[in-house]
Amino acid sequence: MLEKEKKCIGIIFGGESNEHDVSVSSAKTVFKALISKTNINRFWVKAFYINKHGVWLDNDQSLVLLKEKRKNETIDKNQVFPKREINFLNTIEFQGIDIWFPLLHGVNGEDGAIHGLLKFTQKPIVGGGILGSALGMDKILMKKIFSHLEIPQVNYLDIQNQDLSDDKVKNNLSVEIIEKLKLPVFVKPANSGSSLGISKAKTRSEIIKALQKAWEIDSRIVIEEGLDVRELECGIIGNLKLTASEIGEVSYSTDWYDYDSKYSMDNQIIIPADIDSQISEQIKDIAIRSCRALNIYGFARVDFFLEKISNKIFLNEINTIPGFTSKSMFPMLWNASGLNIDQLVAKLVDISSDL
């Protein structure tokens, strides 16, 4: 079939965030799915890689990165978009793209920034819109909305507009945290993913170190009570009608589910999770309600805590561009729900066309 008879999917990946490498891995998975035997007669792909300095590579070099296993960022300066080009969105490289598939995890991607940029092209975008992406990325705003809607969450505090370069400020905050929350606590940057910048703190001195670590990533910080929980996850796809996947559980050998354990070979993924059917249905219901509350559509992964001692469900967070790596839960959840990776990626493209 001629390319002009297929839909051209524009993949954007890489980026300046600290989740750059995860984005590259996700893009490789999606690219392979789009050109698989299942989808080769429906789609063809243009790709645009953004390096860690914010420089865009053209389609030819970006496709090389997707097809090869190399990690270097050799750049031919004749094949890079000028960073401040006035006619950026009208460049010939973008012509012919029917649907965008952004796979930028973290800041400038998952926070809705890339969606805002691509909206000017007036082409459909796979995934959520600007508002839902921004709210899903920002843990403080997300939690305030969920509190208003009485969606269950662990107890938390948020820190904003504080100069944490001042040791006195950190000391005072550590005292307040211990007074208001039960130890241990988790200290998180408000806008970060893949557990980057997150620390578990059991003592006041550890809280001070954790505040500094989080503040180096984001000036807005969330502190949550650390309960003894199971980590459960649910996939969501759809627009007006949202559909929930099977529930999955991550079992890990480390003290908590940090960045290294998320991409470790030692994790055990259990799908469906060994939970009561009533709990499973409650999680699916909360996942759908929470996405609707934040105006999230297209696809998302919703993460939950299930307290071991009480079986209470707590919503943790929503990921509006979940990973598509070989170790990512989102495609595994949908595979267990009847959609293999090729079918899932095609489904997400079709959903974007219906908006």
UniProtKB/Swiss-Prot annotation:
Where does the protein end up? Cytoplasm
- What reactions does this protein catalyze? 2 D-alanine + ATP = D-alanyl-D-alanine + ADP + phosphate + H(+)
Q: What cellular component terms from Gene Ontology apply here?
A: cytosol
Tell me which Pfam families the record gives.
Answer: Dala_Dala_lig_C, Dala_Dala_lig_N
Q: Does the keyword ATP-binding apply?
A: yes
Q: Which PROSITE patterns match?
A: ATP_GRASP, DALA_DALA_LIGASE_1, DALA_DALA_LIGASE_2
Instruction: List positions binding ATP.
Output: 178-233
Q: Which residues form a coiled coil?
A: none
Taking every annotated instance into account, which residue ranges of this chain make up the domain ATP-grasp? 143-350
The record's EC number reads 6.3.2.4
Question: Which GO BP terms, alphabetically?
Answer: cell wall organization; peptidoglycan biosynthetic process; regulation of cell shape
The cofactor(s) it depends on are: Mg(2+); Mn(2+)
Annotated cofactor note: Binds 2 magnesium or manganese ions per subunit.
Arranged from A to Z, the UniProt key words for this protein are: ATP-binding, Cell shape, Cell wall biogenesis/degradation, Cytoplasm, Ligase, Magnesium, Manganese, Metal-binding, Nucleotide-binding, Peptidoglycan synthesis
Q: Does the keyword rRNA-binding apply?
A: no
Q: Which InterPro entries match?
A: ATP-grasp (IPR011761), ATP_grasp_subdomain_1 (IPR013815), D-Ala_lig_Van_CS (IPR000291), D_ala_D_ala (IPR005905), Dala_Dala_lig_C (IPR011095), Dala_Dala_lig_N (IPR011127), PreATP-grasp_dom_sf (IPR016185)
Which pathway does the UniProt entry assign to this protein?
Answer: Cell wall biogenesis; peptidoglycan biosynthesis
What family classification does the UniProt entry report for this protein? Belongs to the D-alanine--D-alanine ligase family.
Question: What does the UniProt function comment say about this protein?
Answer: Cell wall formation.
Output the HAMAP family linked to this UniProt entry: Dala_Dala_lig
NCBIfam families linked to this entry: D_ala_D_alaTIGR, PRK01966.1-4
Q: What is this protein called?
A: D-alanine--D-alanine ligase
Which organism does this record belong to?
Prochlorococcus marinus subsp. pastoris (strain CCMP1986 / NIES-2087 / MED4)
